Amino acid sequence: MTQIVHLSDIHASSAHFLSDVAERVIQSVNEIAPDIVVVTGDLTQNGTYPEFADAKEVIDRIDCENKVIVPGNHDSRNVGYLFFEDFFGARNSCHPLDGVTVVGVDSSQPGIDDGHVGRDLYDWIAKSFETDDFKVFALHHHLIPVPMTGREEQIPVDSGDVLELLGRCCVDLVLCGHRHVPWVWRLNEMFVVNAGTACSNKIKARTTQCYNLIEIDYGDLRIYRVLPGGEQELVIDRVMSP
């Protein structure tokens, strides 16, 4: 079995960051001891060097060798994507990890909040998914509107083309964030999973801080919503098609 922890929207070092909640998240993730940790952006609030340094400290305290991290729109503010590269490496990356391949892309654009993947990446994405592994695609912006988030905005301008590409590549799982509301959509045989904010106070209505735990167990897929203290709610439990 492979376990993936999916965190998003940390917003480190800002007035929105809740350090006590972050401590509980770190502790509960380390108790799970996942095989892979995916962080889908907005590590910072304004993309500044001190914020990235604080975000790096938080993420480094998670005990996992395999981490896939992509930037969000807040991380690209003030040309912060350069600091992202300094602290976390490439903004677009492919990670083949023992039966699971995770492809992470930067869907942000400097100076604006709208999402965009871009045609220049499509061939690389398709090439990265030429595998029989379980396929995971990670980005910050939501590809499908999320309920209970108000007026729809900032969905990637090329989301339709990206979804068609992912379907053609037989991608199993899409992980994203941005809207701070957890949700799961099923699109044909692909699950699109949004994470809430892991440890900021930027929550909507009756939602709370949380993250996702995904278990891939041969033909089975289980998705849990996890609260900072470690309490788990099973959201998806199904047998994937062979």
Which residues does each PLM region occupy?
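Beta-strand-turn-beta hairpins that frame and shape the catalytic cleft
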Residues: 1-5, 94-104, 130-136, 186-192
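A short C-terminal boundary segment appended to hydrolase-like catalytic domains
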Residues: 217-242
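Short acidic, glycine-rich surface-loop motifs adjacent to enzyme active sites
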Residues: 131-148
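Active-site neighborhood of phospho(di)ester-bond hydrolases with catalytic His/Asp-centered motifs
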Residues: 7-8, 36-42, 67-73, 106, ...
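Extended active-site neighborhood of metal-dependent phosphoesterases/phosphodiesterases
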Residues: 49-127, 131, 161-167, 212-213
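Active-site environment of divalent metal-dependent phosphoester hydrolases
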Residues: 13-16, 45-50, 73-81, 110-113, ...
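N-terminal active-site segment of His-dependent metallophosphoesterases
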Residues: 1-58
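Conserved beta-sheet core of the metallophosphoesterase superfamily
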Residues: 151-220
